[in-house]
């Protein structure tokens, strides 16, 4: 299987290197397209106002390119350049930190996997639920196995699998998970260098669903969720007749 690997932590981050090495060790062909620098929280942004450059880099014998763009740019450009040898899967991560709850909206790891799916290639995002544990081997191995399974069990275009792996030497198992309320918070800022740096604020919505990605991973299980790009809400639209009349009034 040919796997395109990307991330948002940058091409020389340990998580993506572990993921690429795990994919190669499993017998897959690997091509890496990743940002030249840290691009966390870039979400699904793409570059429209300038040229992008993909520069080959030494990567332990694997084919790898450093891109001066966003995580989604990396996948978008990578799939274009590989159009005659199209990957079977876009695998992103391993992210340094969880991508649970509302973090999925901000995540470049999730956004770049989604870009693959929108381009017709199955996408899998992999995240390690710790900023302290730097042993990515287990999460990388599990991510590759999920990618193999995802190719055999494809989702509709515009949907991806998002895997959050709890930190530590052991994982109790795998659970299907909903997207939690984590990271829905009132942001706070601290003064820094004449400006303001965002720090985590007060959570606004407590999580009670034991099947949520937050509580599943806190219980020691890996959480696998299906994420989609279509953000249309399930909430019924209120009657529009009065609003329409107001809008159309001359």
What are these regions (language model features)?
Residues 89:
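Short, Asp-centered acidic motifs that coordinate Mg2+ and/or phosphate
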Residues 117-139:
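Glycine-rich phosphate/pyrophosphate-binding loops
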Residues 22, 112-117:
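Hydrophobic/aromatic ligand-binding patch that stacks against planar heteroaromatic rings
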Residues 98-107:
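Glycine/threonine-rich flexible loop motifs
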Residues 138-250:
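Electrostatically charged, flexible surface regions
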Residues 3, 13-81, 85-86:
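A cross-family phosphate/adenosyl-ligand binding-site feature
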Residues 9, 38, 70-71, 95-98, ...:
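Short glycine-rich anion-binding loops that position phosphate/pyrophosphate groups of nucleotides
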Residues 6, 33-35, 92-95, 126-127, ...:
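Short beta-strand segments
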């Amino acid at each position: 299987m040919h796997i395109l690997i990307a991330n948002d932590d940058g091409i020389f981050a340990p998580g993506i290197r572990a993921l690429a090495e795990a994919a190669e060790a499993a017998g897959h062909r690997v091509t890496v397209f990743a940002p030249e620098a840290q691009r966390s929280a870039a979400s699904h942004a793409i570059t429209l106002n300038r040229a992008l450059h993909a520069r080959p880099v030494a990567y332990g014998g694997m084919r790898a390119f450093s891109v001066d763009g966003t995580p989604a740019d990396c996948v978008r450009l990578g799939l274009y350049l590989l159009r005659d040898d199209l990957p079977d899967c876009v695998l992103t991560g391993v992210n340094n930190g969880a991508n649970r709850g509302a973090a999925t909206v901000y995540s470049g790891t999730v956004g770049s996997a989604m870009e693959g799916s929108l381009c017709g290639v199955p996408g899998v995002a992999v995240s390690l639920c710790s900023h302290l544990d730097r042993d990515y081997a287990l999460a990388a191995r599990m991510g590759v196995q999920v990618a193999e399974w995802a190719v055999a069990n494809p989702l509709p275009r515009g949907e991806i699998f998002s895997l959050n792996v709890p930190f530590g030497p052991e994982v109790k198992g795998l659970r299907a998970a909903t997207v939690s309320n984590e990271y829905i918070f009132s942001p706070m800022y601290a003064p820094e260098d004449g400006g303001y740096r965002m720090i985590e604020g007060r959570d606004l919505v407590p999580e009670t669903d034991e099947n949520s990605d937050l509580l599943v991973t806190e219980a020691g299980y890996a959480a696998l969720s299906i994420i989609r790009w279509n953000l249309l809400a399930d909430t019924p639209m209120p009657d529009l007749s009065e609003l329409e009349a107001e809008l159309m009034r001359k």
